[in-house]
């Protein structure tokens, strides 16, 4: 069975967020077109994503030195186990849908925390004599992003770092197909805000039927 991770990185719902509105439209359309696929929603604002901190490094260090899992402190066990769950889930999935806003030219910190959690050697990529090689070569991804300004073209295009980072890291993981659906300009052109949102929702619904 095809497994899809629907990963949302916005604290607001579709009534407030353009990216979440488009994401909801996409995933509902996708489910209707693919009723036999398993869709798992990962709300990054409502799930435990451990930061890679000293306790995590200490826990990993104990395991690498040959100590058993029981040698880790309770907090180390919780964090290390959760990171293993997240990275295993990511590696086992077939498709990834990232729904994010553009904040300060990038994305919310919870998105980077999630990427750090799943970017595990031996699962997402491996090291070879020639360098790192991605392992997720049979996957597919979609990036749904909303931007208040226009960053797809023009003088601000080089300032967009969120989707560019996700494109790069997913490519590093070996993902061969990464598509984008962008909703932009609603703050720059407030008189067209509703039209921009509605267009994004329509495009998302259409893409859900073919992705």
UniProtKB/Swiss-Prot annotation:
Molecular function terms, GO-annotated: electron transfer activity; FMN binding; oxidoreductase activity, acting on NAD(P)H as acceptor; oxidoreductase activity, acting on NAD(P)H, quinone or similar compound as acceptor
Class of the enzyme per the UniProt entry, highest EC level: oxidoreductase
Residues binding FMN: 17-19, 102-105, 146-149
InterPro entries in the record: Flavodoxin_fold, Flavoprotein-like_sf, FMN-dep_NADH:Q_OxRdtase_AzoR1, NADH:quinone_OxRdtase_FMN_depd
SUPFAM superfamilies assigned: Flavoproteins
UniProt signal peptide: none
Cofactor: record remark: Binds 1 FMN per subunit.
Cofactor: FMN
Enzyme Commission (EC) number: 1.6.5.-, 1.7.1.17
Catalysed reactions listed for this entry: 2 a quinone + NADH + H(+) = 2 a 1,4-benzosemiquinone + NAD(+); N,N-dimethyl-1,4-phenylenediamine + anthranilate + 2 NAD(+) = 2-(4-dimethylaminophenyl)diazenylbenzoate + 2 NADH + 2 H(+)
Keywords for this protein: Flavoprotein, FMN, NAD, Oxidoreductase
Gene3D superfamilies (UniProt xref): 3.40.50.360
Family assignment from sequence similarity: Belongs to the azoreductase type 1 family.
Subunit structure: Homodimer.
PANTHER family: FMN-DEPENDENT NADH-AZOREDUCTASE 1, FMN-DEPENDENT NADH:QUINONE OXIDOREDUCTASE
Function: Quinone reductase that provides resistance to thiol-specific stress caused by electrophilic quinones. Also exhibits azoreductase activity. Catalyzes the reductive cleavage of the azo bond in aromatic azo compounds to the corresponding amines.
UniProt protein name: FMN-dependent NADH:quinone oxidoreductase
